[in-house]
Amino acid sequence: IFAGWTIYAAMKHPYFSNPMIYLPLILMGIDKIYKKEKPYLFIWSVAVAGLSNFYFFYMLGIFMVLYAVFRYFEQFGVHSLKNVGKWLGVFAIYSIIAVLIAAVILLPVIFQVLGTDRFKAENYVPLFYDKVYYQKYLSCLIGENMIQWGVAGFSAVSMTGIFVLFAKKKKYRTLKTGFILINLFLLFPFAGHVLNGFSYVSNRWIWAYGMLMAYIFVKMYPELFNLSLKEKRTIFVFLMGYCVLALLPDAARTQRNLVAVLLLVLATFTVLSFGAVFTKRKNLMLMTGGFLIVGILFNMYYQYSYEKDYLS
């Protein structure tokens, strides 16, 4: 819902939406394993993902490992390093079982992909993107598309959730670290090179960013009703800083980006007004839902075109 990837990629290539289906199931499976519940959800989700598409299965594997690592330290802390080997063995066994289930289709596809000219080709990977990429980066998170399949286009209200997250001091450290890390992936071409199978630079993994944004917003939603005055001031500072940095470069001040930032300002001020201008939780719920719907419709309007196969 939050990701422009859903609107853009699923229209152009429907199977590009597959990883957005499998990733939540795999992550739920990881949580079940940590709770010492049955591993069936994890095994079958990984197996079906492997049967579906090797290209996205590779990316899913990377984010699966990252999530498992983050969840481990969140649940057990750094003082439980002695248990790392045990959990590595558990996940290795279940992952091997899943891969063996998918092997009848997965292995032939892997051999075919490894033999293609595209995979064997040597690709130039720059250290940084062009200057304009960084000038438009912040605004493009909720606005227009980036280069190299960097289709973010998140609903503006989800960025409000990010402000709330970082306003909460000494809480949600794992989510904060994950958010910073995934932005670093977008800022350096080498990450796009690695996540694209060490081929040319492409950010077709950005659907995982959308998953993180959605998860953060869901976690922050209850916090919207319990913000202290100090936290509201911090959120206001974040909002002002984002608006200035996002729209300061001339290249970033496009119509789509300006409207997206306007929606962000309205959504954030609505959240900050709760408890002062209005006090009914239902009103905030309705307005937050309204901004979410408007953000989705806004992205659809600017993303689709009546030309070029309905893609802008």
What are these regions (language model features)?
Residues I1-L27, Y34, G50-L60, N145-S158, ...:
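Membrane-interface micro-motifs in multi-pass membrane enzymes
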Residues L23-K32, A49, F63-R71, A214-P222, ...:
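Hydrophobic transmembrane alpha-helices
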Residues G29, Y40-F54, I97-L100, G241-C243:
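Membrane-interface alpha helices of multi-pass inner-membrane proteins
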Residues I33-V48, S80-A92, L229-G241:
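Short hydrophobic alpha-helices at membrane interfaces in multi-pass membrane enzymes
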Residues E37, F56, T177-L186, N196, ...:
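Contiguous transmembrane helix-bundle modules in multi-pass membrane proteins
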Residues L60, I101-Q112, F298-Y306:
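C-terminal TM-helix exit segments that contain a strictly Trp-centered aromatic cap at the helix terminus
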Residues L60-I96, L266-S273:
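Perimembrane helix-loop-helix junctions
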Residues W87-N203, D250-R256:
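Periplasmic/ER-lumenal interhelical loops and adjacent helix-loop junctions
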